[in-house]
């Protein structure tokens, strides 16, 4: 009696499902292509022509990130078309703060059992994020790993490469005392602080994924799955006409941890509380969770997605430009000298 034949599909890896998924995403991927893209989907590597003649001394800037436990909300809501935007945003926002134009993006999707329709929703979000950022989705990896993830769950990661002229790199070294700090508004929690947010909303407040939020017109899933704002086009527009001395992407660590990453030694950032419009979700979380102020500002973006350090003379023009580009922006602080006994580089007043 012959033994039954073992197959890859029987072991949990469905190559046919993978092929179906590739066909579904081909038009999505192609919608992101720039003229520099030299390959079609399905090759071993993605080719992108740098066209170095356009630049004097180009420097490549790379970034990689994920979406974290925000994915848990996508699983609960069974909505998967927004987390791809988050993925792109977390990567491209990290490199545009150094003055780099994002050129291309690659993604990684891992799951226990591939659902081609669900995976296509994820890639649709990634493609939308790439279009918003102006970068091409030139490659990716989809890993089906039986037994590795809970049923219906997945993880995603992204990687982006951009370019900036060497003499136009923004690293904060030109920030000086007296520079003003402009905050660009966030769309909500973005992609950070979700472990604490979930604990407060589901455990402390006892809400369900589709429950209305207090002091809001949104339900829990509508608020918490709002995509991270992508600032690439607005920042690149500013850089054409204004000198920006430093830019901080306010992600995990909030204002308290991210702004010091761009401040020169001896400088501190003083932020005036109440100088910007804070989305109600942050007040809801703070009150329901009885969270201390510093914990809030070290965990969440508190309504500010990016902080720009600029000359005082440019503040009004930059605010006007940002508003014209559809951004909410405010003068929220100033760069000051650290006092002799001062230990923290960020002060909330």
Swiss-Prot record:
EC number: 6.3.3.1
Gene Ontology BP annotations: 'de novo' IMP biosynthetic process; adenine biosynthetic process
UniProt-listed Pfam families: AIRS, AIRS_C
Main location: cytoplasm
EC category: ligase
Subcellular location: Cytoplasm
InterPro entries per UniProt: PurM-like_C_dom, PurM-like_C_sf, PurM-like_N, PurM-like_N_sf, PurM_cligase
Gene3D superfamilies in UniProt: PurM-like C-terminal domain (3.90.650.10), PurM-like, N-terminal domain (3.30.1330.10)
Keywords: ATP-binding, Cytoplasm, Ligase, Nucleotide-binding, Purine biosynthesis
Family designation: Belongs to the AIR synthase family.
Protein name from the UniProt record: Phosphoribosylformylglycinamidine cyclo-ligase
Top-level taxonomy: Bacteria, Pseudomonadati, Thermodesulfobacteriota, Desulfuromonadia, Geobacterales
